[in-house]
């Protein structure tokens, strides 16, 4: 089974590596964003799945800025222009952070800070390497699946992709275990080790220091492990609500049907391909009792609008434009790389997690054959 992820996996860590703060300690972030002649620059943190503005200023012609905010434990903060998605993420602790960037390449900003920021930069370098390799293999899969492609190579490239995915997960686990005193470790574990519950999650939690596990990220990691344990295949699906135009949608809305819930990200080709393939599965199985409830997490207005127009999704889609997670992501422990879906059976039992649209169709075929 091909687990579709890739470039978004790197973007996701900049969006899903979350933060909160309180107390009397403060930090300052200053620097220059070349080419940023006007507009409001915001310093943000995450709170309850939403970005919260902490400080702001109107950028001058020289592109220089200085912002500050309170901080307790070392945590992730963001810089964003106007209403756009956060463009720069950094790990802040008491002291000073310096940023040197260009408006056209904010993802390559040079950021200097404390030891946690240095560790974050080191880790993200490895993640970009993994993402590049996975994207290249994914393109090979697409070319092989083309009309004039070498179909015999699809299985080979798929196996390569899955092998690389397993290597990445093991790398993340080893990285977290090797840095038991880092506040970054539980954040990385809950962001990347998101394929369902594994005893490896408990191993990491035991290895991390009491101070780290008692922090915001440590507590979030404990909650993530609990949710992962409670959403294993064969268990009853947890209840949740997604609201669109004042109408709440939950598993109860689709009682008696096979429900596939999926979180995805607009503006990413692998996510778009996944949703396009899912649409074909829906059209095949909808009359036989399949319902789909999808939720796009984050993403810009223009990208989302274009994707929704081109995809023309026939089911209920609930956008979470300003968030980094929602009830669906939280309840099923679907943090990290998207898309991610869960199949809930007619009786409310979880039948599958992280399956491709092709595998979803196979599962539905099996259920039809053996339940009739």
Where are these regions (language model features)?
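Bacterial Sec-dependent N-terminal signal peptides
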Residues: 1-32, 371
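Thiol/disulfide oxidoreductase modules built on the thioredoxin-like
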Residues: 313, 323-368
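N-terminal "domain-start" segment that seeds a small globular fold
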Residues: 219-252, 315, 362-370
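A non-transmembrane, solvent-exposed segment enriched in polar/low-complexity residues
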Residues: 21-168
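Generic structural signal for well-ordered beta-strand positions
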Residues: 66, 249-252, 351
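Structural microenvironment flanking redox-active thiols in thiol-disulfide oxidoreductases
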Residues: 272-311, 324-329
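N-terminal targeting signals for export/organelle localization
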Residues: 154-233
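Short active-site neighborhood of thiol/selenol oxidoreductases, capturing the structured segment around
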Residues: 249-278, 291
């Amino acid at each position: 089974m091909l687990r579709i992820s890739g470039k978004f996996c790197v973007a996701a860590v900049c969006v899903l590596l979350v933060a909160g703060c309180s107390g009397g300690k403060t930090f300052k972030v200053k620097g220059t964003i070349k080419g940023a002649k006007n507009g409001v620059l915001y310093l943000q943190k995450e709170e309850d799945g939403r970005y919260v503005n902490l400080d702001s200023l109107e950028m001058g012609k020289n592109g220089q800025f200085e912002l500050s905010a309170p901080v307790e434990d070392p945590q992730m903060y963001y810089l964003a222009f106007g209403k756009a998605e956060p463009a720069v993420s950094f790990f802040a602790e008491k002291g000073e952070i310096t940023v040197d960037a260009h408006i056209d390449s904010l993802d390559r900003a040079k950021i200097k800070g404390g030891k946690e920021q240095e560790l974050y930069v080191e880790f993200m370098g490895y993640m970009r390497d993994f993402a590049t390799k996975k994207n290249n293999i994914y393109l090979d899969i697409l070319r092989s699946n083309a009309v004039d492609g070498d179909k015999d190579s699809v299985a080979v490239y798929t196996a390569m992709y899955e092998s690389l995915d397993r290597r990445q997960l093991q790398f993340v686990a080893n990285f977290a275990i090797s840095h038991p005193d880092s506040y970054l470790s539980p954040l990385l574990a809950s962001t990347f080790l998101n394929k369902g519950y594994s005893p490896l999650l408990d191993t990491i939690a035991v290895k991390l220091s009491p101070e780290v596990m008692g922090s915001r990220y440590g507590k979030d990691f404990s909650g993530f492990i609990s949710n992962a344990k409670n959403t294993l295949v064969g268990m009853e699906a947890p209840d949740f609500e997604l609201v669109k135009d004042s109408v709440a949608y939950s598993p109860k809305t689709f009682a008696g049907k096979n429900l596939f819930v999926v979180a995805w990200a607009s503006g990413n080709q692998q996510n778009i391909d996944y949703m396009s393939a899912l649409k074909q599965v829906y059209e095949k199985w909808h009359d036989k009792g399949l319902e789909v409830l999808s939720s796009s997490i984050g993403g810009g207005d223009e990208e989302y609008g274009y994707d929704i127009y081109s995809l023309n999704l026939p089911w209920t889609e609930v956008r979470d434009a300003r968030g980094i997670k929602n009830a669906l992501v939280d309840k099923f422990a679907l943090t990290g790389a998207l898309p991610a879906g869960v199949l809930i059976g007619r009786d409310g039992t979880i039948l599958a997690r992280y399956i491709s649209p092709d595998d979803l169709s196979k599962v539905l075929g099996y259920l039809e054959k053996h339940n009739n």
